[in-house]
Amino acid sequence: MLIALAGVTGVGKSYYSQEIENNFNIKKIHTIRTRAIRPGEIDGITGYFMTEDELDNEIVRGNIAIDFSEFGGRYAYLKSEVFSNDNHVFEMHYTHIDGWKKVKPNMISIYILPRNIEIAINNIKSRNLSKEKEDERIKEVYEQYNNFMNNKELQKKFDYIVYNDFNDDSKTELLSLIGRIVKKWIFL
Protein backbone atom coordinates (compact mmCIF):
# COMPACT_ATOMS: atom_id res chain seq x y z
CA MET A 1 0.00 0.00 0.00
CA LEU A 2 1.24 3.47 -0.87
CA ILE A 3 -0.31 6.53 0.80
CA ALA A 4 0.38 10.02 -0.56
CA LEU A 5 -0.11 13.13 1.56
CA ALA A 6 -0.55 16.41 -0.31
CA GLY A 7 -1.36 19.93 0.81
CA VAL A 8 0.08 23.40 0.97
CA THR A 9 3.52 23.99 2.43
CA GLY A 10 3.22 24.29 6.21
CA VAL A 11 0.01 22.25 6.51
CA GLY A 12 1.69 19.42 8.40
CA LYS A 13 2.51 16.79 5.79
CA SER A 14 5.86 15.95 7.39
CA TYR A 15 4.31 15.87 10.86
CA TYR A 16 1.51 13.56 9.77
CA SER A 17 3.76 11.25 7.76
CA GLN A 18 5.84 10.83 10.93
CA GLU A 19 2.70 10.20 13.02
CA ILE A 20 1.54 7.59 10.50
CA GLU A 21 4.93 5.88 10.67
CA ASN A 22 4.86 5.96 14.48
CA ASN A 23 1.31 4.60 14.82
CA PHE A 24 1.02 2.05 12.01
CA ASN A 25 3.18 -0.51 10.25
CA ILE A 26 3.82 2.04 7.51
CA LYS A 27 7.27 3.31 6.56
CA LYS A 28 8.10 6.69 5.10
CA ILE A 29 9.43 6.68 1.57
CA HIS A 30 12.72 8.50 1.27
CA THR A 31 12.39 11.46 -1.06
CA ILE A 32 15.51 12.09 -3.09
CA ARG A 33 16.33 15.80 -3.17
CA THR A 34 18.97 17.76 -5.03
CA ARG A 35 18.57 20.81 -2.79
CA ALA A 36 20.91 21.58 0.08
CA ILE A 37 20.28 19.71 3.31
CA ARG A 38 18.56 21.86 5.96
CA PRO A 39 19.57 22.09 9.62
CA GLY A 40 18.13 19.08 11.46
CA GLU A 41 17.78 16.95 8.34
CA ILE A 42 19.78 13.73 8.16
CA ASP A 43 20.78 12.11 4.87
CA GLY A 44 19.27 8.62 4.72
CA ILE A 45 16.67 9.38 7.40
CA THR A 46 14.95 12.61 6.35
CA GLY A 47 15.51 11.59 2.74
CA TYR A 48 18.37 11.17 0.34
CA PHE A 49 20.33 14.23 -0.70
CA MET A 50 22.10 13.89 -4.04
CA THR A 51 23.80 16.05 -6.60
CA GLU A 52 22.19 16.47 -10.02
CA ASP A 53 24.78 14.07 -11.46
CA GLU A 54 24.11 11.43 -8.79
CA LEU A 55 20.37 11.59 -9.49
CA ASP A 56 20.98 11.38 -13.24
CA ASN A 57 23.10 8.26 -12.64
CA GLU A 58 20.27 6.65 -10.63
CA ILE A 59 17.87 7.37 -13.50
CA VAL A 60 20.28 5.82 -16.03
CA ARG A 61 20.58 2.73 -13.80
CA GLY A 62 16.77 2.40 -13.86
CA ASN A 63 16.38 2.87 -10.10
CA ILE A 64 13.95 5.81 -10.18
CA ALA A 65 10.15 5.39 -10.32
CA ILE A 66 9.35 9.08 -10.83
CA ASP A 67 11.26 12.35 -10.82
CA PHE A 68 10.30 15.98 -11.26
CA SER A 69 11.41 19.55 -10.65
CA GLU A 70 9.77 21.71 -8.01
CA PHE A 71 10.79 24.78 -5.98
CA GLY A 72 14.03 25.13 -7.93
CA GLY A 73 15.21 21.60 -7.14
CA ARG A 74 14.75 18.07 -8.37
CA TYR A 75 12.96 15.35 -6.47
CA ALA A 76 12.71 11.62 -7.13
CA TYR A 77 11.60 8.32 -5.61
CA LEU A 78 13.26 4.91 -5.74
CA LYS A 79 11.49 2.03 -7.49
CA SER A 80 12.59 -0.25 -4.66
CA GLU A 81 10.38 1.71 -2.23
CA VAL A 82 7.49 2.74 -4.52
CA PHE A 83 6.91 -0.84 -5.72
CA SER A 84 7.78 -2.54 -2.45
CA ASN A 85 5.39 -4.99 -0.78
CA ASP A 86 5.81 -2.93 2.38
CA ASN A 87 3.33 -0.22 3.31
CA HIS A 88 4.66 3.28 2.67
CA VAL A 89 3.61 6.90 3.13
CA PHE A 90 5.11 9.93 1.43
CA GLU A 91 4.52 13.61 0.80
CA MET A 92 3.82 14.86 -2.70
CA HIS A 93 3.12 18.15 -4.42
CA TYR A 94 -0.50 18.27 -5.51
CA THR A 95 0.40 19.01 -9.15
CA HIS A 96 1.95 15.55 -9.44
CA ILE A 97 -1.23 13.58 -8.66
CA ASP A 98 -1.74 12.54 -12.30
CA GLY A 99 1.86 11.39 -12.74
CA TRP A 100 1.73 9.40 -9.52
CA LYS A 101 -1.59 7.76 -10.46
CA LYS A 102 0.06 6.60 -13.71
CA VAL A 103 3.07 5.16 -11.84
CA LYS A 104 1.03 3.63 -9.00
CA PRO A 105 -2.69 3.49 -9.93
CA ASN A 106 -3.77 1.96 -6.61
CA MET A 107 -2.02 4.66 -4.56
CA ILE A 108 -4.20 6.22 -1.85
CA SER A 109 -4.11 10.01 -1.96
CA ILE A 110 -5.02 12.34 0.90
CA TYR A 111 -5.14 16.11 0.54
CA ILE A 112 -4.67 17.91 3.86
CA LEU A 113 -6.49 21.23 3.82
CA PRO A 114 -5.89 23.92 6.44
CA ARG A 115 -8.97 25.60 7.85
CA ASN A 116 -6.75 28.54 8.79
CA ILE A 117 -4.23 29.31 6.06
CA GLU A 118 -2.40 31.77 8.33
CA ILE A 119 -1.19 28.93 10.57
CA ALA A 120 0.41 27.28 7.53
CA ILE A 121 1.99 30.64 6.63
CA ASN A 122 3.39 30.99 10.17
CA ASN A 123 4.82 27.47 9.91
CA ILE A 124 6.69 28.53 6.77
CA LYS A 125 8.02 31.63 8.52
CA SER A 126 9.41 29.45 11.32
CA ARG A 127 11.59 27.45 8.88
CA ASN A 128 14.41 30.01 8.72
CA LEU A 129 14.30 30.18 4.92
CA SER A 130 15.88 33.04 3.03
CA LYS A 131 13.48 35.96 2.58
CA GLU A 132 13.30 35.21 -1.14
CA LYS A 133 12.53 31.50 -0.59
CA GLU A 134 10.02 32.31 2.17
CA ASP A 135 8.17 34.80 -0.05
CA GLU A 136 8.16 32.24 -2.89
CA ARG A 137 6.69 29.54 -0.64
CA ILE A 138 4.05 31.87 0.83
CA LYS A 139 2.97 32.98 -2.65
CA GLU A 140 2.76 29.33 -3.70
CA VAL A 141 0.62 28.51 -0.64
CA TYR A 142 -1.98 31.10 -1.58
CA GLU A 143 -1.93 30.02 -5.25
CA GLN A 144 -2.27 26.33 -4.38
CA TYR A 145 -4.98 26.94 -1.80
CA ASN A 146 -7.06 29.06 -4.18
CA ASN A 147 -6.52 26.63 -7.05
CA PHE A 148 -7.54 23.65 -4.96
CA MET A 149 -10.58 25.35 -3.42
CA ASN A 150 -11.88 26.52 -6.81
CA ASN A 151 -11.11 23.42 -8.87
CA LYS A 152 -13.63 20.63 -8.26
CA GLU A 153 -11.97 18.40 -10.87
CA LEU A 154 -8.68 18.65 -9.00
CA GLN A 155 -10.41 17.84 -5.71
CA LYS A 156 -11.95 14.71 -7.26
CA LYS A 157 -8.49 13.36 -8.10
CA PHE A 158 -7.79 12.81 -4.40
CA ASP A 159 -9.27 9.84 -2.58
CA TYR A 160 -9.73 11.81 0.65
CA ILE A 161 -9.71 15.44 1.74
CA VAL A 162 -9.13 16.04 5.44
CA TYR A 163 -9.01 19.32 7.34
CA ASN A 164 -6.18 20.26 9.63
CA ASP A 165 -7.06 22.63 12.46
CA PHE A 166 -3.56 22.05 13.88
CA ASN A 167 -4.98 20.41 17.01
CA ASP A 168 -5.51 16.98 18.59
CA ASP A 169 -8.94 16.55 16.97
CA SER A 170 -7.40 16.91 13.50
CA LYS A 171 -4.67 14.44 14.41
CA THR A 172 -7.23 11.95 15.71
CA GLU A 173 -9.36 12.35 12.58
CA LEU A 174 -6.46 11.74 10.19
CA LEU A 175 -5.06 8.80 12.15
CA SER A 176 -8.56 7.27 12.36
CA LEU A 177 -8.82 7.57 8.58
CA ILE A 178 -5.46 5.84 8.18
CA GLY A 179 -6.64 3.09 10.54
CA ARG A 180 -9.74 2.51 8.38
CA ILE A 181 -7.63 2.49 5.21
CA VAL A 182 -5.19 -0.04 6.70
CA LYS A 183 -8.03 -2.28 7.87
CA LYS A 184 -9.72 -2.11 4.45
CA TRP A 185 -6.40 -2.74 2.66
CA ILE A 186 -5.71 -5.86 4.73
CA PHE A 187 -8.98 -7.42 3.57
CA LEU A 188 -8.51 -6.68 -0.14
List each model region and its residues.
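ATP-binding Walker
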Residues: V11
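Small-molecule kinase domains that catalyze NTP-dependent phosphoryl transfer to phosphate-bearing small molecules
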Residues: L129-L177, L188
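Hydrophobic anchor at the beta1->P-loop junction of P-loop NTPases
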Residues: L5
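Walker A/P-loop
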Residues: S14
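ATP-dependent small-molecule kinase phosphotransfer cores
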Residues: T31-H88, Y94
